[in-house]
From Swiss-Prot:
Active site: D52 (nucleophile)
Protein species of origin: Rhodopirellula baltica (strain DSM 10527 / NCIMB 13988 / SH1)
MF-aspect GO terms: pseudouridine synthase activity; RNA binding; tRNA pseudouridine(55) synthase activity
Recorded catalytic activity of this chain's protein: uridine(55) in tRNA = pseudouridine(55) in tRNA
Keywords: Isomerase, tRNA processing
Gene (UniProt): truB
Descriptive protein name: tRNA pseudouridine synthase B
Gene Ontology biological process terms from the UniProt entry: mRNA pseudouridine synthesis; tRNA modification; tRNA pseudouridine synthesis
Length: 348
């Protein structure tokens, strides 16, 4: 609850992050604005996956208690459009560092690129770039890289659902990528180029999808980073773009709950029941690979389900989120519980 005794909001806010802005800055600015819209002194806001400053596109913000759902939202795949320039390299793998042109290098044909892309599917081993937010020995890698330190980045396994060559006008290559959390698109493009016998840097990156959320759903937050537009757009309420928290969990099995079960869960008591199949399940191939990927925890993958209240039909087609449930023998344990009175009316 907020300090005035009102219930806090709960949901996901799909935002468009402009290039040049950090995801943390987007969170901070959205938090200040939403506190004003809700009349709250405190409001938890987080993101469900960062975007590099030079990238743009969809950043899904978790509002209020929805931040507790991040491990399950991260199970969703993401979709990107990524542009690369072949035949050049940079220390950071993008335009943030000075470009070095390769000499005496023959650029690949489109057919050669498409042949190489066949090897980048399913579980793939990847070495993240040194200019990244990954911590190495307790410190962000990009800070150590900018100090000129020599260190080794740990390899990790990532999941690529599909990667397609959308256009190729040498030296520019555009890829359409569907992948799991933890994938570095800079590294993917550099690895594809290396397999073709050349170097590459990423020149543009757009995140188009996170699960069922798309760029078309987003609030364009560019105005929050432009002093000239900030006042002009101040009448546009951010809350109208807030989506029910359950929309980030439609890939999970769902159990319909009655009033007695809801009361038991809110008291921390395990319940019995049988969940329904997910309304928007993850692809079978995705589920088969998901526990092989370093960024996923099998305990929070396909084993859990959501408990929902569909008693009055006022919470949209999925119902109102009550709890995240984890199997415990023949019963279901309330891992995360959300009092139904905590939810606010959101657009369906």
């Amino acid at each position: 609850m907020d300090p005035n005794g009102e219930h806090s909001p709960l949901g996901f806010l799909p935002c468009y992050k402009p290039p040049g802005a950090t995801s943390r800055d987007l969170v901070n600015r959205a938090q200040r604005r939403l506190r004003g819209e809700f009349g709250l002194r405190k409001l938890k806001v987080g993101h469900t996956g960062t975007l590099d400053p030079l990238a743009e596109g969809l950043v899904l913000l978790a509002i209020g208690s929805a931040a507790r759902l991040t491990p399950w939202v991260l199970q969703h795949g993401k979709r990107y459009l990524a542009d690369f320039r072949l035949g050049v390299s940079s220390e950071s793998g993008d335009l943030e560092s000075e470009l070095v042109t390769q000499t005496d290098v023959k650029l690949p044909t489109a057919a050669e690129i498409e042949q190489v892309l066949k090897d980048f599917h399913g579980v793939v081993e990847q070495t993240p770039p040194a200019h990244s937010a990954i911590k190495v020995d307790g410190e962000r890698a990009h800070k150590r890289a900018r100090r000129g330190e020599d260190f080794e980045m740990p390899k990790r396994r990532i999941l690529i659902d599909s990667v397609k060559l959308i256009s190729y006008e040498p030296p520019m290559m555009r890829l359409d990528v569907r992948c799991g959390s933890g994938t570095y698109l800079r590294t993917l493009g550099m690895d594809v180029a290396a397999a073709c016998g050349c170097a590459a840097v990423m020149t543009k990156l757009i995140r188009n999808e996170v699960g069922r959320f798309t760029l078309d759903d987003t609030l364009d937050c560019a105005f929050m980073f432009d002093d000239d537009d900030r006042e002009k757009m101040s009448s546009e309420p951010m809350v109208k773009y807030l989506r029910p928290a359950i929309e980030g969990l439609t890939h999970m099995p769902a159990m319909n709950l009655d009033r007695q079960q809801i009361g038991m869960l809110q008291a921390g008591i395990r319940i019995s029941g049988t969940p329904e199949a997910p309304s928007e399940p993850l692809p079978e191939a995705w589920i088969g690979c998901i526990d092989q990927v370093d960024t996923f925890d099998r305990n929070t993958d396909v084993l859990d389900c959501i408990g929902v209240d569909r008693s009055d039909g006022s919470s949209g087609p999925w119902g109102e989120l009550v709890a995240i449930l984890r199997p415990h023998g023949k019963l279901w344990h309330p891992l995360r519980v959300f009092p139904t009175t905590e939810s606010i009316t959101l657009r369906g």
